[in-house]
């Protein structure tokens, strides 16, 4: 989600912008990913647009785009990480898209997903459309960020944060049900 899109949300809902990271003073660049949002703030934005945060399974399906590979291309071509980011986020869509035409699925910012984190969940979950744990202490983020080593920019990597956490490495994208 971009700063520009989030500003529209804030303007129409009387909300407030998140804390400004030092590399985007005043949220001047609308094409940067929105960061410093909590899980609840991300969820509220998605609901406002008629969507929701994707489940972890949906996110992984989207990033893989029909592939079983760990990445959808060479790491320098697909994502921003600690070795090429210059210590900050970058405008969305600057790196190569995946097979579904989605940009920034790996790198730039971690993305909140709907699921609670359970380190062992996938060992016991159904293989088709797992619903995710019903409770937990942290919410899942996926995709890696501009501060991580390149080996973390892989389709299966997952991490967790408390839902109230926010930071210059955490953003989100929304999902919608598409009726054919």
Where are these predicted regions, by residue range?
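Active-site microenvironments of metalloenzymes and redox enzymes
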Residues: 1-74, 114-122, 176-180
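Surface-exposed recognition segments
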Residues: 27, 67-68, 85-88, 105-180
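Cysteine-rich, disulfide-stabilized extracellular repeat modules
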Residues: 30, 49, 74-77, 88-91, ...
């Amino acid at each position: 989600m971009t700063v520009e899109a989030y500003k529209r949300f804030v303007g129409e809902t009387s909300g407030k912008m998140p804390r400004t990271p030092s590399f985007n003073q005043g949220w001047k660049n609308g094409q940067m990913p929105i960061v410093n949002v909590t899980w609840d703030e991300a969820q509220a934005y998605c609901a406002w647009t008629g969507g929701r945060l994707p489940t972890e399974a949906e996110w992984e399906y989207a990033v893989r785009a029909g592939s079983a590979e760990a990445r959808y291309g060479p790491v320098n071509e697909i994502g921003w990480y600690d070795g090429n980011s210059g210590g900050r986020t970058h405008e969305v869509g600057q790196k190569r898209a995946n097979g579904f035409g989605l940009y920034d699925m790996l790198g730039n910012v971690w993305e909140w997903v709907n699921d609670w984190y359970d380190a062992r969940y996938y060992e016991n979950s159904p293989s088709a459309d797992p619903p995710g744990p019903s409770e937990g202490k942290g919410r899942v983020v996926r995709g890696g960020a501009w501060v991580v080593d390149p080996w973390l920019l892989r389709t299966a990597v997952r991490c967790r944060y408390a839902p109230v956490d926010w930071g210059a490495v955490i953003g989100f994208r929304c999902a919608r049900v598409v009726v054919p």
